[in-house]
Amino acid sequence: MLSNSDSKHGQKAYWCVVSGSDLWLVDGQLPLATSNELNLVAEKAQKIGSYNNHPVMWLNEADVEQSLEMHSLRECLHFPEPLFLLMSKAIQYGHMTQTMRFCPQCGGRNHLNHNQLAMQCGECRTLHYPRIFPCIIVAVRKQQHILLAQHPRHRSGMYTVIAGFVEVGETLEQCVAREVKEETGIEVTNIRYFGSQPWAFPSSMMMAFLADYHAGELKPDYSELADAKWFTSDNLPPVAPTGTIARALIEQTLLNMRSDS
C-alpha cells in the first residue's frame, strides 16, 4: 500500500479510482500523479500492480471527498492492454468490497485484507476472494459465413458472437455447444480454444473459442437475442469494438475465411 510518506517523497502513481464499472479519467487518461497532487488519501489506497515503472493504485470513489468525473471502463478499450487489465482488476476489487460486506458462512462483517486482497470475516476469519464467473464466447463459421447475433441491450445495432455462462458440471466445450444450440438452434463441431480476457462487467472471465457449423437451421431464441444471421466478409454489420475478445474472434474468423477462399 502506498503510504503518505511515499507521496511526500514525490512518488507518482497511476490512480484507478472506481465506482461500479466506472473509473476516474482526466482528459481521457488515467491520472498519473502523487496522492497529494490529486488530493487523495493514500492510506485508503491499495497497490494492485505496476505500469511503466509506476505503481498502479486502486481506490474506491466512496473514499474520495471531491467530486470526480467518472467514465465507463468500456471507454478505455483502446488503452494499452497491460494498463487496461490493471484497470479491470481495480474495478473487480471495488466490486468485491461493495458486494461482499458480510460473511456468507456466519454473517459477520467483512473487511479488506490488504495482504491477501480478499474480504475477511471479523468473526470467523474466513477469507472471501473476488468472485470470478466463467463464460464462453465463440465465433461460429459456416464455409464463407460467420454467425453474428444482436442482443436487445445493443441499441447501436452492434452484432457480436455468441456468449454465455458456464453451468455447474459442464466442460467449456460442452458449454460452447449448449449455448450455441440454445440461442441459435444450430449444432457446432471442431471446437477449439482461442484465448481469454478478463471482463469486469462486473467479474467475468471470457474464454474464447472457434467452432464450425455442423447441423441445424438457424432459429434465434428471441427471448435472448434480438437477431442472429450468417454474414459474409463483405456485408458485415457494426461489430464489437477493437480491444474486446469478441472483435478478435471475428477478425480471426474473417482471416481464416480469406485464407480458405
Curated annotation (Swiss-Prot):
One of its GO terms (biological process) is NADH metabolic process. One of its GO terms (cellular component) is cytosol. A divalent metal cation 1 binds at A163, E183, E224. Pfam families: NUDIX, Zn_ribbon_NUD. A motif (Nudix box) lies at residues 164-185. CDD domains: NUDIX_NADH_pyrophosphatase_Nudt13 (cd03429). A divalent metal cation 3 binds at E179, E183, E224. Residues 130-253 form the Nudix hydrolase domain. Divalent metal cations. Mg(2+) or Mn(2+). Binds 1 zinc ion per subunit. A divalent metal cation 2 binds at E179. It catalyses: a 5'-end NAD(+)-phospho-ribonucleoside in mRNA + H2O = a 5'-end phospho-adenosine-phospho-ribonucleoside in mRNA + beta-nicotinamide D-ribonucleotide + 2 H(+); NAD(+) + H2O = beta-nicotinamide D-ribonucleotide + AMP + 2 H(+); NADH + H2O = reduced beta-nicotinamide D-ribonucleotide + AMP + 2 H(+). Its EC number is 3.6.1.-, 3.6.1.22. Keywords: Hydrolase, Magnesium, Manganese, Metal-binding, NAD, Zinc. Substrate binds at R74, Y129, Q197, P198, W199, A200, F201, P202, S203, S204, A246. It is an enzyme of class 3 (hydrolase). Zn(2+) binds at C103, C106, C121, C124. Its cofactor is Mg(2+); Mn(2+); Zn(2+). InterPro entries: NAD-cap_RNA_hydrolase_NudC (IPR050241), NudC-like_C (IPR049734), Nudix_hydrolase (IPR020476), NUDIX_hydrolase-like_dom_sf (IPR015797), NUDIX_hydrolase_CS (IPR020084), NUDIX_hydrolase_dom (IPR000086), RNA_Hydrolase_NudC (IPR022925), Znr_NADH_PPase (IPR015376). One of its GO terms (molecular function) is RNA NAD-cap (NMN-forming) hydrolase activity. Transmembrane segments: none annotated. Homodimer. Belongs to the Nudix hydrolase family. NudC subfamily. mRNA decapping enzyme that specifically removes the nicotinamide adenine dinucleotide (NAD) cap from a subset of mRNAs by hydrolyzing the diphosphate linkage to produce nicotinamide mononucleotide (NMN) and 5' monophosphate mRNA. The NAD-cap is present at the 5'-end of some mRNAs and stabilizes RNA against 5'-processing. Has preference for mRNAs with a 5'-end purine. Catalyzes the hydrolysis of a broad range of dinucleotide pyrophosphates. This is NAD-capped RNA hydrolase NudC.
